[in-house]
């Protein structure tokens, strides 16, 4: 669900003996058409194309739902997918608020589903630019050789400059909604604001209506591996 950027990344359109892509969904017709064409090219088959996510999660051929929309939709879609009996792979952040996250946890447990949050920095081959995976560092920390307690300093400087493009802007000039975009459906539970292209798609990250700020967006990429290294997956950063 959501095939504009991350949802249409190469690793989502890769053959896998354990599963196959059967359907895509997006409220932007251009994104949807592009994903269908890519699916035909990669797999030689026609993917089901849905405009409304509710139609996708009730498709009997769908077992796992991948949520790759802006975060203001994550909680609602995850709860509805769990209620529909689907397992869920959700992009970060899990939700915009703690309350939404609790509702997702409750729905997943109540319906006996599997939920996977896609926090992939802990799996990177060049962890924090050190030229290694996270596993050797995990073994070093667990060995106790570094002592305890450990202090970890995190910097988001890597690749930071280009992220200024994501910073939200005030007093945006209203623009006509593109014909291919269902803007009302894109907004969904978010407050209505006049359309401006900077508020949608990749640059939605700069607006509190759709995301939770830098820490929940790119910040979690840096905090999540540290949580794992320190054995704190069941806690929250302070």
Region spans (language model):
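A short, local hydrophobic-aromatic micro-motif
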Residues: 20-22, 147-150, 184, 237
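A contiguous active-site-proximal alpha/beta segment in oxidoreductase catalytic domains
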Residues: 87-89, 95-182
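Rossmann-like dinucleotide-binding domain that binds NAD(P)(H)
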Residues: 174-177, 184-238
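N-terminal glycine-/serine-/threonine-rich beta1-alpha1-beta2 phosphate-ribose binding loop
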Residues: 1-90, 99-115
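Residues embedded in well-ordered beta-strands within globular domains across many folds
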Residues: 23-25, 66, 150-153, 187
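Short, flexible loop/turn elements at secondary-structure junctions
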Residues: 5, 62, 71, 94, ...
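A structural signal for well-ordered alpha-helical segments within the folded catalytic domains
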Residues: 4, 75, 79, 102, ...
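Active-site/binding-pocket entry motifs
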Residues: 30, 158, 192-193
């Amino acid at each position: 669900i959501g095939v504009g950027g991350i949802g249409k990344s190469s690793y989502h359109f890769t053959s896998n003996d354990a599963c196959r892509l059967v359907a895509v969904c997006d409220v932007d017709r251009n994104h949807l058409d592009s994903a269908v064409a890519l699916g035909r090219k990669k797999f030689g088959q026609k993917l089901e194309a849905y405009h409304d996510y509710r139609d996708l999660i009730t498709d009997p051929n769908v077992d796992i739902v991948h949520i790759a929309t802006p975060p203001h939709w994550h909680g609602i879609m995850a709860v509805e997918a769990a209620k529909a009996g689907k397992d869920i792979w959700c992009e970060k952040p899990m939700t915009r608020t703690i309350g939404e996250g609790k509702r997702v946890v409750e729905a997943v447990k109540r319906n006996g589903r599997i939920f996977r949050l896609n926090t992939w920095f802990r799996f990177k081959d060049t962890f924090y630019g050190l030229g290694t995976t996270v596993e050797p560092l995990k073994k070093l920390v667990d060995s106790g050789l570094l002592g305890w307690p450990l202090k970890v300093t995190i910097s988001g400087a890597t690749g930071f400059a280009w992220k200024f493009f994501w910073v939200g802007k005030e007093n945006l000039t209203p623009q006509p909604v593109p014909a291919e975009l269902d803007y009302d459906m894109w907004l969904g539970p978010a407050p209505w604001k006049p359309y401006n292209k900077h508020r949608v798609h990749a640059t939605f990250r700069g607006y509190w209506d759709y995301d939770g700020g830098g820490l929940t967006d790119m910040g979690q990429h840096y905090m999540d591996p540290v949580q794992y290294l320190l054995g704190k997956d069941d806690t929250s950063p302070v």
